[in-house]
Design a protein with these regions (language model features):
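Fold-independent oxyanion-binding glycine-rich loops
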Residues: 16-18, 48, 64, 83-86, ...
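Residues at the starts of beta-strands that form the adenosine-phosphate
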Residues: 11, 41-43, 79, 98-99, ...
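Active-site environment of divalent metal-dependent phosphoester hydrolases
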Residues: 51-52, 88, 103, 161, ...
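A structured phosphate/pyrophosphate-recognition subdomain
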Residues: 2-19, 29-37, 110-252, 258
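Single conserved hydrophobic/aromatic residue that forms the stacking wall/gate
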Residues: 258-270
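Active-site cofactor/cluster-binding pocket
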Residues: 59-115
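Anionic-ligand anchoring segments at beta-strand to alpha-helix junctions in alpha/beta enzyme folds, i.e.
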Residues: 12-73
């Protein structure tokens, strides 16, 4: 699928997955700016119970002027574009639409619509959107805010760029015209003091299963994206290859299941 194929529709909504992370926000922003450049008036939304409150994501949205909005209800659009997720995949609110499009880098877990572009071998969906924008002749380097968002999306989804394998991921890393000052702020804003206390309490009570070299971490109430950060920290322990971090949410249980051998490490499951 090419981004230009979306131009056949007028009432367009771009949907990020629930509990948005930097990658899905950046992807939605990229598609949003492309459609705006072509005279469309899209909306950028996400659903679910949780409103974005993680410090770095609030900063990302504010500093890069990303017009994302949280919704509980969506009037049926002509086209719903899922970014960094798939329709009925379980990690995003289900809204009705006349037509569905999917742009994703995860493994295919549901039936894909005709309008879809899924590249499961990429480290981040930001790389896919970046490449699709370049294919359409969109000047990503000329937009510092978008370049920074896509670079940060790649940065966070590839373990601070340490898990890059695909050449396209390397190309985005090397070519992105990002804002160094904003990147420094984002890198140093992963945790608030409150979240640090939650993470510390969880780590103190980690259960270790020696037979499987696995750690199980129960986490208190926090932004679900904190689960991935805790898992990353736990996996730095030499005796641990698998980490399951979880917490109880009003709508169920959130899991972050990470194995060090997986190329795409973070899997947030409801």
């Amino acid at each position: 699928m090419k981004l230009s194929e979306l131009l056949a529709y007028d009432n367009i909504v771009i949907q990020c997955h629930d509990n948005p992370d930097a990658d899905t926000i950046a992807c939605g922003f990229g598609v949003y700016l492309y459609l705006k450049s072509k005279g469309k008036e899209p909306r950028l939304i996400y659903g679910g119970q949780n409103v974005i409150r993680k410090t770095n994501l609030v900063m990302l949205i504010r500093d890069l002027k990303i017009p994302i909005e949280h919704v509980d209800y969506l009037h049926k659009p002509e086209l719903l574009v899922m970014v960094d997720c798939q329709y009925h995949s379980g990690n995003s609110a289900v809204f009705e639409a006349e037509h569905i499009a999917v742009i994703d880098h995860h493994r295919i877990c549901t039936e894909l619509p005709e309008l879809s572009e899924v590249r499961s071998n990429l480290g981040a969906c930001s790389t896919l959107v970046w490449n699709m924008l370049k294919t359409e002749g969109f000047d990503v380097r000329g937009n510092r805010e978008l370049s920074t968002a896509l670079y940060y999306g790649l940065y966070t989804d590839t373990g601070s760029l340490t898990e890059i394998v695909h050449p396209l991921d390397r190309d985005l890393r090397d070519e992105a015209n990002f804002d160094p000052a904003i990147m420094r702020k984002l890198r140093n804003a992963n945790l608030s003091l409150e979240e640090l206390e939650v993470a510390g309490a969880a780590l103190l009570h980690t259960d270790y299963v020696e037979e499987f070299r696995a750690a199980i971490v129960k986490v208190g109430q926090c932004d679900p994206n904190i689960l991935g950060l805790i898992s990353d920290l736990v996996l730095e322990v030499d005796a641990i290859d698998i980490c399951v971090a979880f917490n109880l949410q009003p709508e169920g249980v959130k899991l972050s299941l990470i194995h060090i051998s997986e190329p795409t490490r973070h899997s947030l499951i409801s």
